[in-house]
Structure formats: structure tokens, C-alpha cells
């Protein structure tokens, strides 16, 4: 609602008007200026136009059983399906309300048959309309209302009303009648739980007067006026209870006659609004209030027609469907305590706006009434193709569905997304007008019938007539071509000139007549088949805007013959004789509405109040805002396209509701500069400075990306700009709109509708849009245009409906570079980091797979082989990855990839190819649109080079750490900021109190992996050299407990050793920290990431489904801005990191043991003494700043400072910044405007927080944690990138160990193939690759095809890899683990102190009901598998002799998944050991008990968790 009003205003501040009435009517006055430009001269007329509106109407309102909506109730009392979790409610009664167990059990039995229906829309509508009627009373404007009579000298129309205005009431009274009505039985209620099945209202925050108001709104509503919102309504419930501290008796006394009407009057409008505010806020009914406000606004008023035919519109009344009332929110006192669930961001925003300015509802109703009538008329115009043809392909089915009837009309009129009502089976519709050619007969008094279709004293009107001109939403892109409603158009020459006039197309004739009437001329015409005698275009004398003539929908009328142009008595602008070839001049007409005010009667004039989006920000504290995709299509919108009207979920990429398929062929390279597409233009951006830099554009084809409109046009930097470059179009394309050097109008392209300012450059126009424009409510293509400018996409192609032209330009497609001769596969080398076990697929295997897919795919791969050979790229992993990529790439992208000069032409060698791939894909991210033309398959092409390319400059690394370029922030403000964040976590985070003994007892489970280093000789006794033994897992588990606890005595410092991490397409420096700092830090800040989960998706909250949901929540009703830090680790000063640690220590010091407090002080001091061993000189140097990548606190520190820098820079204080997510150096911000992104970059620059501008994507990609969350992949989560999947498919991570079991290998292969299937559309390629992987497994491990097949199909409880619910259990996979060989440097894990300590801890957890040695053997066996050397495991399959038992295990598989709170569960599961630490706490104790009751508790835990 708020966004619709704001979008349809002239600037970002909206004009708002309070309800007013003069006998049911008011008038909106507008001051208008129209410019006429011809012969390099400009003439203008400033004049006033007005539009009457009537509040009179008689809608038919039906109350039907609707759906129950429990949004706003605390999350913990709801099920995953959105129902009420009764068990949780009963547990709450026992635990916090002090209700005895037998009383709770009895209550549970009583409520088994109760209904849990909750819907407050009917009550909220009663309260909202009572408020508006009371405002009229206080203004002295309350009356029954009447419809004004129409009299134009030809006909007279007077429509009857039910109640005579002179005999009607003069003030609002209670809508019920105590003398005749029966009232609901209500009673005050304050107990902990209900006793009868009736609605329970929760009105605890309301005053007695406000409670009385709510009670009366539950009563029957009698219609006492003719106003549309004063509709008849039954009492909302026969019985109900209200939860309040006091028994309110005023209403009862009035009903019983103990109080007079004067003693019990309706409260003032302020009290009503206060009651409404408190009721909605306390019950958290934001979604339902949104629905109520939408419905009321849609029926509140209609425009009073200024033509006789328009009165047919007033004869049709709406059919409104409202759900019956129900309430369960007051049944229990705690249902509304805690985080509210399922609140819509759009609803929350509208609620905030309406409570700030209630006038928003009335203003929205004015705009809707105009757009509804105009849209219904345009439906017929578009459906009939301007009368020239019946367009059966034009989709207008949205008009036939009641839930989308109004929204279809709004979208048809404005070209914008029209928001739905937010609830199913709730609607406003006009059933008599479902067919666009419905006939209406208007009773009239005939004075002069010429020009009217009159039959039996009735005016016959076909379809919905035009009742008004769209002043309230002007300018509006009502058509895809230039027209008077868009704000700017050009009068073109006639089709042909005759002796007595000129012949025009129908639309051109309307444009001509419209302009002439404003200038002071009448236009006479003739059309074929006219039988009514109409000879002049009609315009009301009150506004002079000519209506769209009725004949445009007549299929028999092809052209209009303009016979004469006659000067009126009141003439304003002298124009040439436009219907004469000798005097014709091309005339450009521009219209602007300057201001608006409303008037109700002679002396009641109301000027607009203003509301600014900057001051309307939903308060999200304690509210879980969800995304539209999780509700249903009723939280979506309706959009107008060239094919018709389409409905779809808001911002839900998975449905691709607005995608259009274009027939596209790649143009020849030499042809790419001409034609309609502007693909090679020079877009300039002046540098940022204290004053705008002026540019004189002399070179053709040069356009400023950012300009400032003041008294003149200036090319400026983005920080100073008011407008940004949006599109470039040929002058001929918009010649109907403008021929001037500068002009503003509403423009509808094939992919977007937006208000633009056109600036002429030679024979083209650059279209500019205000930087403060709300881009979220525009189309995806419009956001793509903005992203291209913001990210400076050099190869972006303007004036094209598809992104494919831009791709062809960015990749510089040239078919001539494709190989003509093929020599086959070459001999390929392996990079030094690639061991045998890291490679899964090789080039020959991929070519063989391609042959099974299709000959064409094999041809594509052979082309790649030759292209790579020409570039001298012979790395096996890179070749295999690129082959896998082309094998799985969508068909439409393969040619432009193979024919790309930007990729395949240039310096030879892997590094040069990597650089070109990186440069190309970087631009592609900025033109991606998730819900229009997704390009995720082309992201991150540099990843295709896989591992082993690139290098690390250790001298540069050293320079960065000795001379750091860090963010500059005030440390006192940083401490306060971070401390507040940590304090806010105490509701959800509990600091883990422990001693050294507790900590070391569980070290087997929490010990981190990775290489181990120590600067102390005594630690080296437990560090075992060797590829498989020099790691923290072995070292820490070999150490006795006392050795670890004594580490605290060492000086506080952090020592780091350098190493290289081989990543996709690059190498990165890694700094592995010393063992002691790692263990002490982990002890002091155990699971410290959990302190951030209340605010950021880290730790357990970083799971893919949770992150995807969180990001979708954030982007509901907003767009994304991905801020990319430049080498974030190097931007932290030592002072900033020390401050963060001190804030953590001071926040949780009271929760620490003495040993933890000592360790925490050690950690704080250690960050001041950080040293790195130079790999070249082998000397230690002390860090002057920056963060070490291998530190225990890397993610924690990066996440905290990531958020803190933005907080201190003032990013979150910017008006348009709505929300953000942070994890490590990743950050995504939700916003709506280009200007906001510019201000964010500026704010971060001021504190020296560096970003990579080219990677800061605005509106295009919603990337967070390397996943595009703007669209859904095959698994229903965010879409990941094909290039990454191909790289993983070919080559393992360097850190991974050699797989020891065929089952483990096949399990990993299955996961990789599943990821690949979610990212590619070539499923046949996935099948062929799977066959190659299985073939490779049988060869390496020496197993038969039948065993591989059995492993694929058998359920996991039988040793297979299938997780299907009904996977077979008849076959069991046998693995001989005893055949593993462990390194000779280390003894058997059964003798390790860490294994013994952990086994003892688990034994104690089981209550000593399980043999200690059995537990120890299991832990030792899991440890043994981590250090095994060779593939000596024997895998066989045989018939399962205990199939019945396996069926039970299959049934219970993962039955308690998610209940175990073990932080390091993945480690345990990998070792085939169930996660055991902490499972005796919380809900996980149920899993513990279930395991103990089983015959084999260890096996049971493994299955059920």
C-alpha cells in the first residue's frame, strides 16, 4: 500500500489526504502545466483540473468460513505446518503457570474437540471503518450521502440511493440498535487456560474505554448511511471472552438501559485509533490488518464520472468476501510472549506507515479507485487490440479470479506489480463485469439524444466505461507506446491527408484531440459505421482532458477521419493546423502535475500532508519476518506483460513467474555495433571529489553514467548524482514520446515500466532514472539495468529484451575461432598438489561420457580439447574440469562459451587463461536476474582451472602485516557497540562453564583437525612427523590431561607458521597458529560462534536451509546489495581485535570458572603478541596488525568486526537499509535504492574499510556464503554454481585424505552427483558421469559390478548409501575394517589418553549401563580409521539374515535427528561413532533414553541420530 502510493507520486514524498465528504462527495484539485514544443519554441498553459469522488456505494458483503491464520503467535507454540503445537502449550501450563499435572491432563482431554480458528479481519475492518466515520463526524461532514446528478445539456442522470440524505443521521453512533438487536454474550476472563470453546480476545493493554470500543465492534452493524464503508454486517460471534484485568461494564449497562446514549457515545477518533493500534500490536495482527486495510480501501470510493457513459460504472457494486471472525490468542496468557512467527515484511511496513499517517488508507483508496476503473477499461482495449483484432493470446485470466480481479485492473492500468490481499478466499470483485463486453443500461432523461446510444430511455454502455482521467496516478504507463497518460508524447503526421481533413490511427487521433483540447481547440471527426451522431472528441469542461474515445474498441473502426479543428471561445495556445500537410509541425506535448488538494464543500479545503519512506521502518525486534514464498500466492502480486497479466509469488525465483522466452540468435561480430542494440558504447564516470567535475561530451557514443539535474545537466561522480544511466534507445524508438533534448515521462519497455528522464545524444536518447527510485517494486529487468550501471559493466548491451546480447558482447563471441581440425586428447600433466586419490574423473573418461550423451556433446568437448591445446594448457585437472563443465552446460550457453574471444584468444598458459575467465565471469554476475534470466551457470568461470594454478607472494604478505592498511574506528565506540551485541545474546546463549578437567575429558570430540605446530620442545614429544600423523587430533589425544592444563603457564602469544592453500583457480596464504594458543583460546571461548547466532547465521545457524530461509526473509520486499570486502583479514588493527576480546570477557566474566577467566585474560593479551615465521628468511617477525587466517577465532572475529565496522560507519542508520546478514567476510544488505548503495560505499570509505567495487553487486545477485539465494536450486535451497560443482566432481579438496572404503567413495560420489544434478539441466550427462564413476570405483577397489549396485540400492542401516524411506534391506554390505594399516610412527589408538578419557566420559553418560571396554573399542576403532594408510578394506555384499531387525532400524533412522546438541557431531559420524557429548541434556535426553532401552545402545544412537 505504502509503496504503491509512493510509486505513483511525483517524488519520493507522497501526498496524503484525510477522509472528507460533502454529502458523500469530495473533489481533488490538481494544478497542471502542459508544454507545447515545436519549431524550437515552447508554449505552455498552466491550468487546474479536478476530479470528483463519491463515498457512496452499496457493496454486497459476504461472511464465510475462511482459513485460520496464527501469524504473530510465539514461534515455540506453532508447528512446522503453521498449526498450534498443543503439547508445547500444555508443557508451558505445567512449567510456568504452576498448574497441577492432573488439571492440565483434564484440560487436555476437554480441548480435544475444540476448534482453533483465528481470523480477525472482520473485526479490524469494523474498527478501521468506524475510525473513518468518526473522523467525518468530528469534521462535521457525516451524512447519509448522495450521488451527484449528471447534466450536460444532452442527457440528465440521477441515480437513486437507499437513504435520503436530508433525513439521514448527522453523526456516527454505535452501529448496533439496542432496542432490536441481540448482542453477543461476552465475559471478562483472566485465568490461565480456557474452559469453553469460544473466541477469546486478548485486550490486556487497552483502557476501559478502548475495550468498550472493541466489544461494540463485535456487535451487529446496521447500515445507516449510503457510504460504501457503512455496509451491513452481522455480530461477529454469539459468545466470546476477553482477557483483561478488569470487568468492563459500560457497554453492558448501556445495552440493559442503565446508561443513556449520551452517557455511552462512541469514543473520539484518536481513542479509536489508539485501540486499533494497541489491539494489533499486542496481538501482532500485522498481516491481518494489511488484509483489512486493503479490502476497505478497495471499496471506499469511486470517481464521479464526468461523462454520461461513465455512470454505468457507478451502477455496479462490489462483491466482498470477508472471513468469519475467530480468536484463540486470548485463550492462554503466554501465546503472545516470545518471537512472533510468520509476519510479512510488507504488512509490517504498511502497518507502521498507517499508524504514522492514517491518511494513507484514504489516499490509497483514491488511487485504487482511479486505477481500477481505468484498468478495467484498458482490459477491453488491450484484449481487442485497439479494436483492430481480437487478441485471443492476450492473457486476462487474472480478471476471472476473484482474488486477483482488483489487482489485475491495477496492474493493467499502471504497468506495476499490484499487491494481493495477503489472505486466501478474501477479495473484492465485480461479478457482473467478469466479461469485458458486459452491457449496462443507465436510466436517463433525454434532452438531446445525438451522440448517445439510447434505447428505451436507457443509455446502453458496453463494458466498463472510462469514468475519469488518471490525475491521481499521473504519469502512468497505461500503454506500451506514447500516449497522453504517460506525461510526454509527440503528435505525428497523419496517415494521409485529404481535401477535407486527415486520416489517423485511432491512438494518434486521441493524442491529437487531447493536445488540441488543452490548447483550446475542438476536434471534429467521423468514423466508419457511426450511428449515434457523435462528431467531436469529448472532454469535460472542468478538466479539458479528452477521454479515450469509445470507438477504439470497435473492431469495425480502423481509422479516424479528422474533419476539422475548431478554435474554442476560451483559447490558450496557438498551434499550427495539424490536419493540414502545408501547416503541419511535429509538436511535442509534455504535462506535469504540480500539486494536489481536496475539497469537501465550499469552505473545507485540505492540503496534503506528507509522509516519507525514510521515516517508516518496521521494528523487527522479536518478530520473525518471513518471505512470500513460504506463504502462498496470496502474498504475491499481479504484473502486466505484453502477453497479458500474470500472477506469481513476490520475489520467488523458483516459479519464474515473469520470464519471457525470446527467439534469439547470436549476431555476427561485425554486426554487433549496429541495429537496435547498443552494445559498444563508452560510459564514463567522473572521479569523486569535493565538487562535481564537469564534462563536455564531444565524442559520439559517449554517455555519462551518473548525472545531476539542477539548473543544467552535469556529468558527475555517483556520490553527487541525482540520476543514473538506465537505458539507451534510438531516437526513432521514442519519437512518439519526445523529440526534445530533455524530457520526462512514464515509459513502458518490453521488460520494464518506469518514470524516466530522457537526454538526447545525437540520434539516440539516454534514459536516466532517479537514484532515489525504489527499484524493488520495478521489474527484474529494470533492476538489471541499474546493476549494470552501478557495477560499470563495460560490455552491457542496452535496448534489448534479453541478456543474451550482453553475454555475446562481454564474451566477445566470434564463430570463426571454433576449431576446424581435431587431433584428439593429448598427454596431460598433473599439478604438484594432485595426488592419485584426489582425482575422480580424467579427460578420457569425460569424453567417453559425452559420447553416451550425444554426438553433439562429444563434438563440443573435442572443441574444448583443441582450444586448450592452442593455449598450451595441459594440466589434467583443469582440462577435465572444463570438459565436465561443457558437458553439463545448458545448450544455449555452450556456443557463446566455445566461441568467446574474451576467453580463448590471448596469451597462452594456465595463469593467463585463469585471468581471462575471472574477468569475464565478474561482469556476468552483475547482469544476472534470478527471476528473469538467471546466469548462475556462467558464474565463477575461473574455478574451472581447479587446483594447482596461481602463486603466493610471501614478501607482499609480509609487507601487509608489517605496514597494515586497517579500518580506523574509535575503540571506545567499538567496545560499546560490540558489548551491546554480546549482551543481547544472553537470552539465547549460555556461556559453557567448565574447568580444565571438564574440557580435556572430551577432547577426543572437540579437538580441531589440521596440521600442528608448537614453539615449545616439550610439546614436540607428542608431535609425530609424517603426512598422516602430524595433526592436532593425534597430538592432543596423545597428551595427558595435565599437560594440556599446564599450558596456561606459558607466555600469552600467538605464533604462526605459513603454508599455501590450493583453492579453485588460485593459491592463498594460510597461517597455522601454535598448539597452545589454539587450545587455550578454545577453552576460554568454547563454541564462541554461538554467541552470534541470535544475530548472524554462524555456527549451527549456517546450515544451508537456515541460511536460505534467513536471506529470503531479509529480501522479502527488498533487494540485495552484496558488499565485498577487499582482503578482509588485512583490515583489522590489533587494537580492534583486542577490544572485541575484552568486550567478550567483560560480558561473560560472571559466567566463567576461575580457570576460564584466567584463560580469557591470556587470550586477550595474546592478540597483542602475534608472530609469524617468514618462510624465506626463517626468522620471526611481529605483526603490527591484520588477522591470521588459521587462528581459532578467525570466523568469530571477522563476523563481529564485519558488522561492527558497518555499525560504526553509520550504514545501519541510513534510511533505506532494512536488514543485513554477516558471516566472516561475507555481508549482504537489503535495500531498495541505488543511492543507498552509493552512500554505503561512501560511509565505509570514510573509516577506511576497503571494498572491491567491481564485486559489490547491487540488485543482481543475492550471494551469501557462495550461494545465490535469489533463486532456488533443485533441492529447494539457494542455487549454487555449476563451475564449482564441476571442479569438485573432478578433484577433491587438497586437505582430504585417501578414501579407504568403496562405500565412502560412492557416498561422496553420490553427494557430488546430487549437487551436479541440482545445478545442470543436462540430466543425461549426470547419468553418463555416474556410470564412469562407478566404473572407476570397481577398477580401483577391485569390487564387482553387483557389489557396486547393491551399495547404491541398500539402505544406510544395511551399509549402503541410499536414504530412501523404502530402500531395500534384504542385502547387507560387509566391510572388513580390520584390514586398515596404520602409520608405523604411531601406536594403536586404544592406548591414547584422549581415547580413554572420552570413553570414560561416555560410560558415565550412559549411567554405567554399558561396558566400558565396549565403548572404548568403538572410540578406538573410529580413531583408527582416521589414520589408516591403504585401501585394504574388503567390501562384500550378502543376504541380510536379520532383515526384520533392519526394517525397524530403517523405520527409526534419523528419528531423533536434530535433537542431539553435540557441536562436533560430524566428526563422530565420520568415524562411525554416535555423537555422545551433551546428549543427556535438553530434548536430546529422549534419544538417550531410547538408546539405553535398546539391546545395543551404541548402535541405536548411531541409527536414531
UniProtKB/Swiss-Prot annotation:
Transmembrane segments: none annotated. InterPro entries: DNA/RNA_pol_sf, Major_coat_LA-virus, Major_coat_LA-virus_sf, RNA-dir_pol_luteovirus. Its EC number is 2.7.7.48. It catalyses: RNA(n) + a ribonucleoside 5'-triphosphate = RNA(n+1) + diphosphate. Keywords: Hydrolase, Nucleotide-binding, Nucleotidyltransferase, RNA-binding, RNA-directed RNA polymerase, Transferase, Viral RNA replication. SUPFAM superfamilies: DNA/RNA polymerases (SSF56672), L-A virus major coat protein (SSF82856). It is an enzyme of class 2 (transferase). Belongs to the totiviridae RNA-directed RNA polymerase family. RNA-dependent RNA polymerase which replicates the viral genome. Catalyzes the transcription of fully conservative plus-strand genomic RNAs that are extruded from the virion into the cytoplasm where they function as mRNAs for translation of viral proteins and also as substrates for encapsidation to form new virions. Once encapsidated, the positive strand is converted to dsRNA by the RNA-directed RNA polymerase. Displays ssRNA-binding activity. One molecule or two of Gag capsid protein is replaced in the virion by Gag-Pol because the fusion protein is essential for RNA encapsidation and replication. This is Probable RNA-directed RNA polymerase. The gene is gag-pol.
